[in-house]
Amino acid sequence: MSKNLTGVGGSLPVENVQVLAGKELKNLPNRYVRPELEHDDVVPIDNSLEIPVIDLSRLLDQQYACDELAKFHSACLDWGFFQLINHGVREEVIEKMKVDTEDFFRLPFKEKNAYRQLPNGMEGYGQAFVTSEEQKLDWADMHFLITKPVQERNMRFWPTSPTSFRETMEKYSMELQKVAMCLTGMMAKNLGLESEILTKPLRTVFNREDELLPSMSSCGEGLGLSPHSDATGLTLLIQVNEVNGLHIKKDEKWVPIKPILGAFVVNIGDVIEIMSNGIYKSIEHRAVINTDKERLSIAAFHDPEYGTKIGPLPDLVKENGVKYKTIDYEDYLIRSSNIKLDGKSLLDQMKL
């Protein structure tokens, strides 16, 4: 199998959401309408239930590290989601990535479509995880890239407009990989492991930019991203504009996330749940659409290297036994690329 996501599986072709939105529809097409949203239990946004905030500078400061490590461990155990502040990623790198992302999605459809996904592939501009003609669809378009390792990049999908996009993505992905390696090293420490046990395998980086198109209130209820847990190891997300919409599932209720300016929203993925033998759990989340304006976000997914086996780490199975299967990453990638976003359905396949 090719290592650049060609041949691992891809979505069935569906019409581009930007094209559909340009038709000024009076109603959302039926495949995008989610009647179940009317019955969902959503925590009011002014409620005190908020995800933890972790300060990376304190984790790295000997004076505060002990307390912050305990707080970090609690966030991973009880939430699987947290906001990361004082992360060390240069503000100018983040802001330039935001600007270039906005500029890319503002391009005419014809220009963006030059970077469209190929059949049976994940990379590029389009949609993902469409596996049947009947499933409900997300009211969003995405642009998906492999950024690390460098030799696995397929530059066919890397835009040349805006002209700075490639250089910006290079700098951004490099800095975020450093942060992810630091966090996974701290996770390993909290689990009683050597830091490289988690940092060494998670060196593949995928970047996905999402544009959730606005929907007029008369169009009915839809979702920009279906409820799911990330199939990857660790995700770092930054919101590009001021439009909120990320919800996480906590105690069977949907909790809206209020991003802190300049912070990354970080979440544990299925791979770390498997490797930790369920000590740290991935969390179901979704994105809702706004009635007035599009929502833009950039997610950096940190995944195992090709040739890696995914399974519970031996030092973490002694007390409670093995809870998950061990499989080759390539096989896992094929599974994750050919399943619709549906809660934790992929992880359920991995349980013993």
UniProtKB/Swiss-Prot annotation:
Keywords: Alkaloid metabolism, Hydrolase, Iron, Metal-binding, Oxidoreductase
Cofactor annotation comment: Binds 1 Fe cation per subunit.
Notes on how activity is controlled: Inhibited by O-phenanthroline, but not by EDTA.
Catalytic activity, as annotated: (4-hydroxyphenyl)acetaldehyde + dopamine = (S)-norcoclaurine + H2O
Miscellaneous remark of the record: NCS1 is a 2-oxoglutarate-independent dioxygenase-like protein that catalyzed the cyclase reaction without oxygen.
Function: Involved in the biosynthesis of the common precursor of all benzylisoquinoline alkaloids such as morphine, sanguinarine, codeine or berberine. Condenses dopamine and phenylacetaldehyde, 3,4-dihydrophenylacetaldehyde or 4-hydroxyphenylacetaldehyde.
Protein's name according to its UniProt entry: S-norcoclaurine synthase 1
Organism, as annotated: Coptis japonica
Name of encoding gene: NCS1
